[in-house]
Amino acid sequence: QKELNKSISLFHGLEKLHEKEKIDAFAVRCWPEMFTEYGCASCGPMAMMNEKKISAACEADVLGSLSCNILNQLNNKPALLVDIVDVDERDNTTVFWHCGLAPLSMAEKNSPSATVHSNRRKPLLHNFALKAGKITIFRVSKSENKLKFIVMKGKVLKRKNSFSGTSGVVSLGPNTFKKINNLFLSGLEHHVCFTYGDVFEDVKSLGKQLRIPTYTI
């Protein structure tokens, strides 16, 4: 109960920072200190902030948080930072996952539950399969030390949760394996963001307006 209370207090702390300092995007150093020094997981609190469309990215990923914030502004729907953790060439799919910071509105019906971190065994995390639907995938990247936008379309398929936490099986259309391989070869950071819906052209327009090179996959 003590660890759970600490996790909930993180949510209230982030809320207060948002209200007091007018902060719309957070990059949280979620490990190891959150576990070893404070004693809880920050995934659940960040998920609740993401639900409010206040970007909360884990692993202190500043550009990841900015990426989510841009999607929030363009789409007025929650965005989520994920790892690309698996690619199945035969199935033409990849898996998007993170420990448990997806907002509940992204959950497949009747699938959400609360859980503890798979490694650290501390609360609070969300646990569910991502709901099926079309998505826009985006990253503000500095790969090769050059600022750029990466944007692509995808679709979350109706599949079971692949891992503990929050995950979804995603198709990027034809040649998903090749597209993911090209991303990795380009040196893209290991996080991408997505939101449900199609803001592909909006991202391209923003890149043009800001004069930031925009690459479509």
Task: List where the protein language model places each region.
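Flexible, glycine/charged-enriched surface loops at secondary-structure junctions
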Residues: 3, 22, 29, 77-85, ...
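Generic structural signal for well-ordered, non-membrane alpha-helical segments
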Residues: 3-11, 59-63, 196-199, 203
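Short acidic, glycine/serine/threonine-rich loops at helix termini
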Residues: 36-42, 92-95
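Acidic catalytic cores of enzymes that act on phosphate-bearing nucleotides/polynucleotides
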Residues: 40-53
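Predominant activation on well-ordered alpha-helical scaffold segments within soluble catalytic domains
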Residues: 11-15, 64-72, 203-207
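A charged, amphipathic alpha-helical module
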Residues: 1-40
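Extended hydrophobic packing segments that form well-structured cores
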Residues: 121-217
